[in-house]
């Protein structure tokens, strides 16, 4: 006989806590099942519990108790949920135009007030401004530009009888021809003299003021006259460093302030006397080096030629790497304003810089890009790059901005006045009279009724139940007396013989037929019914009588032999009465069935 299997011992069930009973109250108890079950049937082994927990917990996750997940803290003690940052939508951009050209000697731009406010507020309030300037900002100082009708390209062509444009005088090929070299030397010498005699304009001082206020992030200039760098706030560094820090002014095409040797790259201050000759001057550093080598018995390496440190067409810019680093750093800094002034943007590198800065600045909600020149920008790539196109002279822009000079550090002073000074000013100006008209007050109707009491107490309610209040409108009279007096004072009616006309009865409007819709959001009215159409009566139709139960549902007889096919009229009777129909004779074969 096989030994009897014993059930594993189970631990006594713990008493449920109030929290556990609340969560398990919806579960069925063992007594609710139809079949008898023992308490041992609800006991599980440790392996079964681990298998059930693995089904609930996915791989890589674990269930935490309330104490573990919240660190034993209640919901009120937990930190508030992190709010999401609201990102504003892109600002709607449109290009505005401002015309500052002189109008018959008048300088009133009242009809362009929004554009003027945008121009002035940008220059006065923005903190990270980038300016890209051309030769147009120096024309007021007496320095000619390049591409205008009176520019250098036109004048040099006529002066030196050049077959091509005067642009050839700024090409690197000038040192390959002796005649072009002589013309180039003369041009450089004259430009240096004009730059030395000129002084900064109002627009230059405005830029310097922005620099002294630390609101000018960078000034990219294409000029070689060096007027900007003559002011300390706009000083530059030659040569530029590849890494930061960089100066505030970046000279994209060099300057006439320096000259450099084409061989040893020796750089020194520009000397006009050395260029007062048809050929290029020799480098003094190369002369000393060559003399030392000759005295020591070494072979000569040659003597280099000096030239102004400016960038000509078809040659490499010595500061190209440093300028590229500065441009990339300024684009990453995300300026809030761009001013392109006095340039036609014919240089490809400058065009790329303007496009990159415009896209970055206009992505900012408060970013503003401005173009200041006598002509609009050329090319479809600049059609949607600027918020404001200013047509006019940049000197007028500086006058409208009304910024102090860069070297004017005086602060606005407010004089303190004593009472004696105030009386003196009053005596000088005379008595002041201010007429103040009082507005008409609207009449307020007096309240004749009883006011609602502000508060109610039990004592007041008891007193109100015992005492009666008199109506002030009755003036101490009773209600019956008032009614009798109103009947006596009633106006006399007219004689009974004259009858008043009966009031006109309102005729019901005829229902209008459904209107026809001919076009979208347009409804045509239905035509009115004429009296002739109203007189036409509809034909009266007899009512359809219901068939009695068991009657044939078709017009033809069910069996041809059961009834005669004669059109005899049925006896007249009342509608709704049943009639008995019997045949005159019995059909063949029916008698046998009946028997």
Curated annotation (Swiss-Prot):
Annotated Pfam families: SIR2 (PF02146)
PANTHER family xref list: NAD-DEPENDENT HISTONE DEACETYLASE HST4, NAD-DEPENDENT PROTEIN DEACYLASE SIRTUIN-5, MITOCHONDRIAL-RELATED
Keywords annotated in UniProt: Metal-binding, NAD, Nucleus, Repressor, Transcription, Transcription regulation, Transferase, Zinc
GO CC, alphabetical: mating-type region heterochromatin; nucleus
Deacetylase sirtuin-type domain ranges (all copies): 109-428
GO molecular function: histone deacetylase activity, NAD-dependent; metal ion binding; NAD+ binding
Protein name: NAD-dependent protein deacetylase hst4
Residues that hold Zn(2+) according to the record: 261, 264, 283, 286
Principal cellular location given in the protein's record: nucleus
Reported function: NAD-dependent histone deacetylase, which could function in telomeric silencing, cell cycle progression and chromosome stability.
Any single biological process term in GO: negative regulation of transcription by RNA polymerase II
Family stated for the protein in its record: Belongs to the sirtuin family. Class I subfamily.
Cofactor section: Zn(2+)
Segments of skewed composition (Basic and acidic residues): 478-492, 530-543
Protein localization: Nucleus
